[in-house]
Swiss-Prot record:
Keywords: Coiled coil, Signal
Domain of life per record: Bacteria
Family that this chain belongs to: Belongs to the UPF0422 family.
Chain segments annotated as coiled-coil in the UniProt record: 20-66
The name this protein goes by in its record: UPF0422 protein lpl2888
Region annotation Disordered: where it falls in the sequence: 50-81
Residues annotated as signal peptide: 1-19
Length: 530
């Protein structure tokens, strides 16, 4: 009797255990059934591929049988003849972990074709392109390297927005990986001229500019940009190839998303948003030579979220000049307009609290130990100058194939005579530009012509001409290139006019004297963009 009770107790205790084992066995059976179904599906697919392959092979054999028999003596293959290679197409698969890239410390990925690894991807994939968004123009004018140096941060914002909108339009999600845009240019040039102060014709063949740009769109809100440029200016001593060095032309971080907010922020080394300096010429306009300012500011800006509308920016930076307070600031305002896709343009103006940091003010190109070399010159200049305010007004309008550019920039107060003078008085340098252009097709290639008139006032010490007449012809013979030829006629200040600028302590610069003469220059350039 006791044994029966013990047996019954053991049976009661073991029944839950058997139930659990039965459940596990059922789950295992279901899993094996699913695997068997998957294997059967793969087997059916392979059998279908085999049947298709046999069918195509039989068809090929039938076609070969209907061809006339080839002669037994085959012609000898000539040296250098191309040997036909056999190729086939395969589907490429991405083999990656199931986990999200940000949830694991390492993200090994591979591209597989024909059951072989084509390439490995270790880390986050990077997409590279010389432009963001639209298909590039034939002449490469929309490559990042050719974006205007003024407000380049805003133009990159707009490009990134167009790219993301294109993804969304076809149903793709916004990329969660950085898009690295690599772009660059090389522009060799030849010039022939008869300068103001020489009776001999001069000429030169040189590398006008060379630059490599990197724009990294990290996500929909942040972008970084670096431009490394070749320094073409000759050294003070020694052959000019000794100065063939690359330096940081621009580098900045931009934070903004025009789809979410019209506000943006930029910090780094950039050209401050003062002036426009647009030109189709080979040579830089006198407005740019006078006032374009590259420094290291912080910029708070506003850009209309539409293609047209108002824009503006305020900025501040530390000045290179040492007299008085070091801080310099400015403001830029404008409006972009367009009517019926035929007329478009931009008007704007700006103010800067010191124009003394402009490139043409810091360096005038004078030889060592001669005339004023710019406030930044060690031998012919001095940074201990008063900060002088300046303003800019510009406008650009395009209609069909025609475009017109107008701009004026200048100091709105006089420099101290010991800082920058004209005819013995404090100079108030100014510059203006008017340019008319037209695009057309020449020899079935995109081309353009442009004519311009430029003018300066009280800018003799900066080695700028009093008046300039200039014309250019541009054509894109090959894709991503622009071939240009320019004629420039400069007229100097009068022989009774003289100017000077700040000199190192204890020294005096030689005065810059007007000649009343004219100078003619012919320039030819080929620009290659990528």
């Amino acid at each position: 009797m006791k044994f029966k009770k013990i047996i019954l107790a053991l049976a009661c205790l073991s029944s839950p255990l058997y139930a659990d084992q039965d459940q596990q066995l059922k789950s295992e059976i279901q899993r094996l059934q699913h695997q068997a179904e998957d294997l059967q599906a793969q087997l059916n697919r392979l059998q279908k591929q085999l049947a298709n392959h046999k069918s195509s092979q039989q068809k090929h054999e039938q076609q070969a049988a209907t061809k006339p028999a080839e002669p037994q003596s085959k012609p000898t293959v000539k040296s250098g003849a191309a040997i036909e290679e056999k190729y086939h197409s395969s589907k490429v698969e991405v083999h990656a972990p199931d986990a999200h890239p940000e949830s694991i410390s390492f993200y090994p990925t591979a591209l597989i074709a024909d059951n072989r690894v084509v390439t490995y991807i270790a880390g986050t994939p990077v997409v590279s392109s010389p432009f963001l968004g639209d298909r590039p123009a034939f002449d490469g004018s929309d490559y990042i390297v050719n974006i205007s140096s003024i407000n380049r941060d805003v133009r990159l914002l707009q490009q990134r927005r167009r790219l993301y909108r294109a993804y969304q339009k076809i149903g793709y999600p916004i990329p969660n990986m950085p898009i690295i845009s690599l772009s660059g240019k090389t522009e060799p040039a030849a010039t022939f001229n008869n300068p103001f102060r020489s009776t001999n014709t001069d000429g030169d063949i040189t590398l006008g500019s060379s630059e490599l740009d990197v724009a990294a769109a990290l996500n929909e809100n942040v972008e970084a940009y670096i431009a490394i440029a070749y320094d073409e200016s000759p050294p003070a001593i020694g052959p000019r190839v000794n100065n063939s060095a690359f330096n940081l032309n621009m580098g900045f971080v931009n934070i903004g998303n025009l789809d979410k907010s019209p506000l943006y922020f930029t910090a780094g080394q950039v050209y401050v948003p003062f002036g426009r300096y647009s030109s189709a010429m080979v040579s830089s306009p006198v407005t740019m030579n006078l006032a374009r300012t590259k420094t290291r500011p912080v910029i708070f800006g506003y850009k209309s979220q539409g293609d047209t509308g108002p824009f503006g920016a305020v900025y501040g930076y530390r000045s290179d000049t040492t007299l008085g307070r070091s801080g310099v600031g400015g403001v830029n305002l404008g409006y972009i307009f367009g009517f019926d896709n035929d007329i478009n343009g931009e008007i704007g103006g700006g103010f800067i609290s010191s124009v003394a940091d402009a490139g043409g003010m810091q360096s005038t190109g004078s030889n060592v130990g001669t005339t004023f070399g710019g406030f930044g010159s060690i031998t012919n200049g001095n940074e201990n100058v008063r900060k002088t305010k300046a303003a800019d007004v510009h406008g650009h309008v395009g209609y069909d194939r025609y475009n017109l550019t107008l701009e004026w920039v200048g100091a709105i107060q006089s420099f101290r005579p010991q800082d920058l003078s004209f005819n013995g008085q404090g100079a108030r340098p100014q510059a203006a530009q008017a340019e008319l252009g037209m695009t057309f097709m020449a020899f079935n290639r995109p081309a353009s012509i442009g004519v311009g008139y430029q003018w300066t006032k009280e800018a003799l010490a900066l080695n700028l001409p009093k008046r300039r007449y200039v014309g250019v012809f541009n054509i894109s013979i090959w894709k991503d290139t622009v071939e240009s030829i320019e004629y420039r006629h400069d007229i100097d200040y009068g022989i009774t006019q003289f100017a000077n600028g700040a000199a190192p302590q204890g020294f005096v610069n030689l005065p810059t004297l007007g000649t009343g003469k004219s100078a003619d220059t012919v320039s030819a350039q080929i620009g290659v963009y990528f």
